Amino acid sequence: MNIITTTTTDTTTALLRLMAWLSPVFPVGSFSYSHGLERAVHDGYVADTATMSDWLRWLVTRGSGWNDAVLCAESWRRAVAKGDLVEVAELAEALAGSRERHMETMLQGEAFLAAARSWPSSVFDRLPADCPYPVAVGAVAGANKVSLGLTLAAFLQAFCINLLQASIRLSVMGQNGVTATMSDLEPVLAETATRIEKTSLSDLGSATYISDIMAMKHETQHSRLFRT
């Protein structure tokens, strides 16, 4: 009997690499960052499953999650086309709106590149030593021939999963709430990833001011679980 499958060996390998790079156990220290969520919980903006779902939805479609994914896509394209990755890295760093957001993206980017060198590629020579996280992910994925669509969908999901893990530690919700939220956000993530495939740097923009302010206020928060 012949078994027909639509997954090729190359696609499977690419998917395995992507899952490894964006896994919570990949050594980038993502567990120590809440992206301002800790302050949002402290100030009452996020208090339960519904408000957490809304918070993520806005970040992914109108906020920092959107911008990071646009930067990831641009880096992917430049890695494939042998374009200027330093330029997009400098832009991504400049877009970090506060000290802790800057720390979060730069330290994770540095750690990602160090760990991803287990998959040798010439793209590392084209990236700056100080590289924002979404630029690092996009460039490495592009250089390893992982499809842009898969890269963006996985990147957005990893962004949400990290904050959902933080929400458990902050006692916003339990594991059932997390799985319900991921199911609820699935079409949003898929649609947003598809939209971002067609974007350029001119599509960068954010309207999630409260999230940005929470990231700034967290800098002076005395009692904390997270670095950001």
UniProtKB/Swiss-Prot annotation:
InterPro entries noted in UniProt: UreF, UreF_sf
GO molecular function: nickel cation binding
Entry superkingdom: Bacteria
UniProt entry tagged with the keyword Cytoplasm: yes
Compartmental location: Cytoplasm
Disulfide bonds: none
Keyword entries, A-Z: Chaperone, Cytoplasm, Nickel insertion
GO cellular component: cytoplasm
Quaternary assembly: UreD, UreF and UreG form a complex that acts as a GTP-hydrolysis-dependent molecular chaperone, activating the urease apoprotein by helping to assemble the nickel containing metallocenter of UreC. The UreE protein probably delivers the nickel.
Family label: Belongs to the UreF family.
Its job: Required for maturation of urease via the functional incorporation of the urease nickel metallocenter.
HAMAP family: UreF
UniProt protein name: Urease accessory protein UreF 1
